[in-house]
Structures are given as C-alpha cells and as structure tokens.
A protein has these predicted regions:
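Periplasmic solute-binding protein
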Residues: 1-4, 86-90
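Sec-exported extracytoplasmic/periplasmic mature domains
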Residues: 3-4, 24-31, 43, 47, ...
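Ligand-binding pocket segment of bilobal, Venus flytrap-like solute-binding proteins
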Residues: 4-78
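Extracytoplasmic/secreted proteins, especially bacterial periplasmic and envelope-associated proteins
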Residues: 15-21, 25, 37, 41, ...
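Conserved C-terminal helix/tail region of periplasmic/extracytoplasmic solute-binding proteins
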Residues: 40, 148-179
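Solvent-exposed loop/turn segments at secondary-structure junctions
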Residues: 54-58, 80-83, 95-96, 112-114
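Mature extracytoplasmic/periplasmic domains
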Residues: 92-152
C-alpha cells in the first residue's frame, strides 16, 4: 500500500486491488509463502530475499555468522515505511490467577529483567529505563531500535470490518495462488 502511496489502513476495494495487482505482478518470482521456514533458508543461503519480522531476520543473521558459511544477512525497513512490530502479554478475562499474571508481567517490566531479555533475544523492549542496561551493540542496532526518522514512517495495523477482512483474504489468496 505504501509503495503505491496508498493509506495502509484503507479498506477501499479499488485501492486494495491496486496493491494486490502489484503483488501479482511479482508472483512469478516468489518461491513460496511461509511464516517460519524462511529463517533457516535465509541463514543457509537457500533464500535471497524475504519479507519477515526483524527478530526472525536477526536470528537468521546470527545463525549465518555462527556457521561462518559466507552468507551475509541484512535487514532493511522500506523507505516508504512499514508496520510496527511488537509482542504483547495479555491476561485472559477469565484467568484463574490474574494476580500471579500481573506479578509476572511486572517482573518482566523491571529494567534489569527487560534489558536481560533484550540482550538475550535481540528484541527491543518497551521499558525506557532498561535502555541504558542493554548492550551497546544491540541498543545502537537500527534493526532492533530503528532511528526516529524511520520509526516516524511506521504504523500499526487497524481493525478492519468483516467485509474488508474477507476482501483481504480473497485478494491474498489470489496473490498466493497466482490467479
């Protein structure tokens, strides 16, 4: 959508069709659509380009470096912008022990714990006071902590109407199947 200068939140069928048509035009060059196999394939050189989550790309980069296989993995956010990515913790409405869940979340949000998690998994965390505790190589990696000018071009997904969800599903199925 952004590549076509369209609003990524649009539910307009004509705009969504334009985006789908662009994806269909490159479909012959797409090897497969998969949400997890690309990490290993990218790390071992079996795939040359993926659209994926930063954490997955970082894992592929680290695996390639550890294997010393000559594969160089890099991550890039399109200049037009991209969806923001983040993981969440949620407590089900009918949780049997919500106090324990809150205690666990509060533990994870302690600066030292959040920084230790970031240092281990190479995912940014939402705790500003943890940032100084994060290893400098991670803290300054724009793959993990995008600079402000890049972050300003990012967006979160919106909630679609059921009709728009159906249209997205139909168009995406057409893209994947090459129709």
């Amino acid at each position: 959508m952004l590549f076509r200068s369209l609003d990524p939140h649009s539910g307009d069928p004509a705009e969504l069709q334009k985006a789908a048509d662009l994806l269909k035009s490159i479909r012959p060059y797409v090897q497969n659509f998969h949400s997890s196999q690309y990490v290993g394939s990218l790390a071992n050189g079996g795939t040359c380009l993926v659209v994926g989550w930063s954490g997955d790309i970082i894992q592929a980069r680290d695996r390639a470096e550890e294997a010393s296989n000559g594969v160089h993995v890099a991550y890039s956010i399109p200049k037009e912008g991209a969806p923001q990515w983040f993981d969440m913790l949620a407590i089900p409405k009918d949780a049997k022990h919500p106090e324990a869940a809150y205690a666990f979340i509060n533990y994870l949000l302690q600066p030292k714990v959040a920084a230790a998690n970031t240092n281990f998994i190479h995912y940014a965390n939402p705790v500003p006071t943890a940032t100084p505790l994060v290893d400098e190589a991670i803290r300054t990696d724009p793959t993990i902590y995008p600079p402000a000018d890049v972050a300003a071009k990012m967006f979160t997904y919106s909630i679609n109407t059921p009709e728009t969800d159906k249209l997205y599903t139909r168009l995406w199925t057409e893209v994947k199947t090459g129709r």
